[in-house]
């Protein structure tokens, strides 16, 4: 009942990702592929370009070819996976018994607030662009805001949907600039990708990072994959998440696995905070 290549005897798992141009998605694909290869499996990678129709087509192909399992990172809340196909999702909730694997987003948000305050910040901001769908990534904001409230610190928020232009963040920053000073001195961005864009905006406005404004992202992305961090960041344990996904989809774990597995995160200095 397994899909095999022409006479080679390779066993396949399929991974569905929305877009490989996103460096976090590429990192996820890398580690999942490595975990599968180490177990004698091969990965069929589906880059769906955020197209729900393509995702459905990929799942139909899985059902027809009897691929062993699916590891999905999808923005489609209505994606249906056949009940006889083992499946795992990353960060998103799928219907049925599919387990969701994620980093500890809530505590990651709390940690970002703590680090900004430890580095002397007194007025914080949270910036996010993303899907309106319910997902584990939403908890980054929840944890950050909760920690700000616990420390009795002001927290300004700017949240955009996926289709909004990034220039709206620049307008937001400009609106909070008075006499050459920004209204907040610490910013937590929902991803490293957004953090890098915001840092460029700040510097265009004459704001020094980290001297005037400190910025923390989320993901743990490195330049060229293995060099310096793009920014100070909350690191997702992507390799451990990939191993967990593979263990689940291969049935190597306890059959009574909970519907959500959260893996611990950590902070790393990347030059956009004071320490």
Model-derived regions, located:
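Single conserved hydrophobic/aromatic residue that forms the stacking wall/gate
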Residues: 1-12
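Short beta-strand and adjacent tight-turn residues that come in two discontinuous sequence segments
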Residues: 72, 126-127
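Short acidic/polar active-site loop segments enriched in Thr and Asp
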Residues: 68, 121-124, 185
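Flexible loop/turn connectors
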Residues: 174-275
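Hinge/beta->alpha junction and helix N-cap segments in small-molecule ligand-binding domains
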Residues: 18-27, 46-54, 101-111, 127-174, ...
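Alpha-helical recognition/docking segments in bacterial nutrient-uptake
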Residues: 14-114, 177-178, 182
């Amino acid at each position: 009942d397994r899909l095999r290549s022409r006479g080679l005897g390779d066993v396949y798992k399929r991974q569905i990702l929305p877009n490989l141009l996103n460096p976090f998605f590429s990192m996820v694909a890398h580690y999942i592929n490595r975990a599968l290869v180490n177990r004698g499996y091969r990965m069929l990678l589906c880059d769906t370009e955020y197209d729900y129709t393509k995702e459905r087509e990929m799942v139909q192909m899985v059902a027809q070819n009897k691929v062993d399992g699916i590891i999905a990172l999808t923005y489609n809340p209505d994606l249906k996976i056949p009940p006889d196909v083992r499946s795992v999702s990353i960060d998103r909730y799928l219907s049925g018994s599919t387990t969701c694997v994620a980093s500890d987003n809530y505590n990651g948000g709390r940690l970002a607030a703590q680090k900004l305050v430890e580095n002397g910040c007194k007025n914080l901001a949270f910036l996010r662009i993303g899907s309106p769908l319910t997902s584990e990534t939403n908890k980054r904001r929840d944890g950050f805001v909760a920690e700000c409230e616990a420390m009795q610190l002001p927290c300004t928020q700017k949240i955009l949907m996926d289709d909004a232009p990034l220039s709206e963040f620049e307008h937001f920053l400009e609106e909070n600039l008075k006499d050459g000073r920004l209204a907040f001195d610490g910013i937590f961005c929902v991803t490293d990708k957004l953090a890098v864009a915001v840092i460029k905006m700040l510097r265009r406005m004459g704001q020094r990072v980290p001297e005037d404004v400190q910025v923390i992202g989320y993901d743990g992305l490195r330049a060229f994959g293995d060099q310096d961090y793009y920014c100070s960041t909350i690191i997702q344990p992507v390799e451990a998440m990939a191993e967990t996904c593979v263990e689940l989809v291969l049935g190597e774990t306890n059959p009574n696995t909970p519907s959500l597995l959260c893996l611990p995160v950590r902070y790393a200095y990347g030059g956009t905070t004071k320490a």
